[in-house]
Amino acid sequence: MTTRQVEHEYTIGAPAATVYRLLADVSHWPQIFPPTIHVERQATGAHQERIHIWATANGQAKNWTSRRTLDPEALRIDSASEVTTAPVAAMGGTWIVEPLGADSSRIRLLHDSGPSPRPQDLQWIDRAVDTTRHLELAALATTSNHAHAAEERELLSFTDTCTIDGAAKDVFDFVNEADRWPERLPHVATVRFEEPAPGLQILEMDTRAKDGSVHTTKSYRVALDTRKIAYKQVTLPALMTLHTGVWTFTRRPGHHRGELAAHRLHQHANIAKIPRRAGQVADARDYVHSALSTNSRAPWASQG
């Protein structure tokens, strides 16, 4: 059997340098690409890196490791898999960004996958590649356009920090063991929890609001040692189009500091339903910040 190759192409109304920068910086991929949950990066040489990606494919949570070679002069990024997850045996690809003018560019995505002896695996891979790449290219176009036009009003980022007396591992375990939250957190009614691979978690929970209403949220989470837990919420209220965050845990003498860092989300344009003066962007930002900050501090409050 031979290697299977596919090419996708997309035209974007943004400078080639802007598009390339978004592709090169994997730290922002969870905010750019809908399938991407979290990415860890390790530099391995000049313009060389190894990345560990957690993402969804055909609705399933997967993870894999790839090595990448970046060529900022040619606006080209080559990648090849080092560790894959079934049914993928091997996978690689190339991003090529071609300038079409001062404010437009063409993206070419060349993708190849290794042979598989089972027809159903080939069908699964073809469907995953086609769906994922179309989502990624469309999302990249949207993000590139926003980055070129400046989107500060729509992006909200904040950090909450709490200091807790106790062992670092105990606090990490409390956040990590989300399946036990109904017995530990009063606002959590029920939890549906899966861990398809070590450290890769699917968390769906029903929470009670102060008015007694119950809301369902679903998130993918990645637990890394006892250092941090990254998450991406995929069921969102009308006010938001994106919600990602990272719990980071930093040990201090006699204390454990739990820090919710890089908590990023995009606010939806329709903000008229917030329980304050309708239609005010500043009010929407304050409301969302307050709500998320309260939720993020709930586990710490119960540990205090």
UniProtKB/Swiss-Prot annotation:
It holds the Pfam family Polyketide_cyc2. One of its GO terms (biological process) is antibiotic biosynthetic process. Gene3D superfamilies: 3.30.530.20. The keyword ATP-binding does not apply. Signal peptide: none annotated. Keywords: Antibiotic biosynthesis. Pathway: Antifungal biosynthesis; monensin biosynthesis. SUPFAM superfamilies: Bet v1-like. Is needed for correct cyclization of the oligoketide leading to isochromanequinone formation. This is Granaticin polyketide synthase bifunctional cyclase/dehydratase. It comes from Streptomyces virginiae (Streptomyces cinnamonensis).
